[in-house]
Amino acid sequence: LKHSTMADEQATGIMKLKPSQISPRVLTVGDPARAAYVASLMKDVVTVAQNREYHTYTGTYNGVKVTVASHGVGGGGASMAFEELIMAGAKLIVRAGTCGSFQSKYREGSLFVATGAVRNDGVTDRLIPPAYPATASGETVAALQKVCEKEEGLNFSTGVMLTEGGFYDGPLGNQHQMWAKAGVLGIEMEASVLFVIAGIRGIKTGGIFNVDNYIFSRLEEGEGAAAYHPHRDIVIKGNERMCRIALEAVATMEL
């Protein structure tokens, strides 16, 4: 990977991004290693910046310029990434990440395309009142669905996700059963933050998620978080497929 040198431009404060280095089409992931994996699927890749958990690359996919960036875990840090990517010129941001499934039909390796997200993120209430919806762009949902439908043997669904601000439960417990009964597909930690920021900043957005556990099977076993094993082959292969699908959708959408 080549390292970019644009000394004359002003970089953003946290991610160190310069507008000339960023494509309007951006794919974001939590894990810096996953960002590097996505970069390996592209050509003519330039390492834009690597600061803290934020690793950013720009390259081409099927001849289209795309940027991939990692945002770490949780809505607070991710919000800084989304804001700075928009400052640097992003017009489309898609998040690809892992999730827990609330629906028994969708187990490890299944994919969810988000139409929106429940705002339990702990971040967006300070940006705009809770009545403001966290929704994906219709065009982005359609593009992700179209690519998913071409994947042989893929079990996927489209619907609402739950974004939570924390991973481990405390004395208050959780409301997983309620959200499952309400038809929420699964739980993750950043989507609603992206959707709200994209909405108020006026860009297109979306999210696709690979199931790395079925929430209720591990809770019924009485092991709780100790039964969480996200590094199995079926999950790793699902992550790779998710990244390929997201990259194709980002590269083919009209802006």
Features from the language model and the residues they span:
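His/Asp/Glu-rich mid-to-C-terminal helical/loop segments that flank catalytic regions of hydrolases
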Residues: 218-255
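Active-site rim beta-loop-alpha module in soluble metabolic enzymes
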Residues: 134-182
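Generic non-transmembrane alpha-helical segments
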Residues: 143-153, 197, 241, 245-253
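A C-terminal functional module that forms or caps the active site or interfaces directly
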Residues: 173-216
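Flexible, glycine/charged-enriched surface loops at secondary-structure junctions
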Residues: 44-50, 151-159, 253-255
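Metabolite-binding pocket within alpha/beta catalytic cores that recognizes anionic/polar moieties
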Residues: 2-142
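Short acidic/glycine-rich loop or secondary-structure boundary segments that cap or lie
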Residues: 102-104, 120-122, 166-172, 196-197, ...
